[in-house]
């Protein structure tokens, strides 16, 4: 295994209703959660390629901005401008086999709305967590919407489908999406021994609504990766990297 490049992607699983009432969760994201994200981002802002970048689904980010105070909104806008808060192409995890075409189009539109507002590129990557399986409508929908990469993290108690570590998921139409499907919400820090590529995305996903990693954890991750791969390019990034 020859790893040339490692990208650390940091994310929290957004679950509206599992850990608290829905309104309480949304308010938490717009207050304490945002403050914690800002603290880690600020603490790592001078670390160059290792500055913390937090990736969110599009809809809770939009809702966070709508609900937060003007002071927090200004801070959030600054973090987005600095590239330390990012979002992917989907609004949240969903059961898309129960959705109609209109639902799918609306869902993809939330991320595009944020891209227009913040004048950022449209995301070409998507992430869903906590749903054990998805049907073949998903690659059709995503590829039609310009999404090229998908990460799926199934529940830890569920056995994932026996697929390669990274594969092309092809819809009946022939459209396809590059896909990773892991047991658990994210990936391991280090790539598996059978990883076939020279780039590794370490998707470090914290549990339901639990918030961002600390600056010290970011430094610890870097030290472990640098020890294992002394010649690799290591950086924090988003799913689009």
Identify the meaning behind each predicted range:
Residues 1-241:
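Catalytic-domain carbohydrate-binding cleft regions of carbohydrate-active enzymes
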